[in-house]
């Protein structure tokens, strides 16, 4: 079946003008995730912020109670004992100058990036490579840290970084279609709570304005914003 026809069929039964309670929306999305692979369940939160203003930037990290369901490759910039700690904690790639050279050459064999503070002068050179991918280590979200073992375990265990995009939207994967409805609802509420706690001082009016849930290949379902808390 062509993707267009499949999506059209999946949209049947969804009222595009209606806002559904979160649990009902998740059920509808799961029922329509019928691809041969285990689709990712994604959430989009439209926020009442303008991220072009520094005092309206939203970013942070949340530990999803039920994990993400995906295998996350973690790269760590560290030396000596901290490099050993990172390896012992399960980091996939660990290095210093050698890892910087690999990344500069375009060999990025990780999805998340962690660094010890002393490595940042080196890692700072990679801003043009890691920045656009949203992978630049940042102390505000715990990826520049001396606790590399804790950061690696968190990244592997279900921590999700979020950052508002230009249009004022936070998007994140919150699990897989194979997850139970209850686990997906718990993960979505954890994300919404973390985004709420990250509300910037410059935000005025309604903060979480619109919410939608979808699967990788399926249609979006609009959610009552009040039901995500």
UniProtKB/Swiss-Prot annotation:
Annotated InterPro entries: Ribosom_uL1_bac-type, Ribosomal_uL1, Ribosomal_uL1-like, Ribosomal_uL1/biogenesis, Ribosomal_uL1_3-a/b-sand, Ribosomal_uL1_CS
Record's keyword terms, sorted: Repressor, Ribonucleoprotein, Ribosomal protein, RNA-binding, rRNA-binding, Translation regulation, tRNA-binding
Gene: rplA
Keyword Transcription regulation: no
GO molecular function: rRNA binding; structural constituent of ribosome; tRNA binding
Function of the molecule: Binds directly to 23S rRNA. The L1 stalk is quite mobile in the ribosome, and is involved in E site tRNA release.
Gene Ontology cellular component terms for the protein in this record: cytosolic large ribosomal subunit
GO-annotated biological processes: regulation of translation; translation
KW ATP-binding (keyword) present: no
Family affiliation: Belongs to the universal ribosomal protein uL1 family.
A Pfam match: Ribosomal_L1
Protein name stated in the entry: Large ribosomal subunit protein uL1
Subunit note: Part of the 50S ribosomal subunit.
């Amino acid at each position: 079946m062509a993707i267009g026809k499949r999506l059209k069929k999946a949209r049947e039964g969804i009222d595009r003008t209606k806002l559904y309670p979160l649990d009902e929306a998740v059920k509808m999305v799961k029922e329509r995730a019928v691809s041969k692979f285990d689709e990712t369940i994604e959430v989009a939160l439209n926020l009442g912020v303008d991220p072009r203003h520094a005092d309206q930037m939203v970013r942070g990290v949340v530990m999803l109670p039920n994990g993400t369901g995906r295998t996350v490759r973690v790269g760590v910039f560290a030396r000596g004992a901290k490099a050993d700690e990172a390896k012992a904690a399960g980091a996939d790639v660990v290095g210093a100058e050698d890892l910087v050279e690999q990344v500069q050459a375009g060999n990025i064999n990780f999805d998340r990036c962690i660094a010890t503070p002393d490595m940042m002068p080196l890692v700072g050179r990679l801003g043009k490579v890691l920045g656009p991918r949203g992978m630049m280590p940042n102390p505000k979200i715990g990826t520049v840290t001396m606790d590399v073992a804790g950061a690696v375990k968190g990244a592997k265990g279900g921590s999700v970084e979020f950052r508002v995009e230009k249009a004022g939207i936070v998007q994140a994967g919150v699990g897989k279609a194979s997850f139970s409805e209850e686990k997906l609802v718990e993960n979505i509420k954890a994300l919404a709570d973390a985004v709420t706690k990250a509300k910037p001082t410059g935000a005025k009016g309604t903060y979480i304005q619109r919410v939608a849930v979808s699967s990788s290949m399926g249609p979006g379902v609009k959610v009552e914003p009040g039901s995500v808390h």
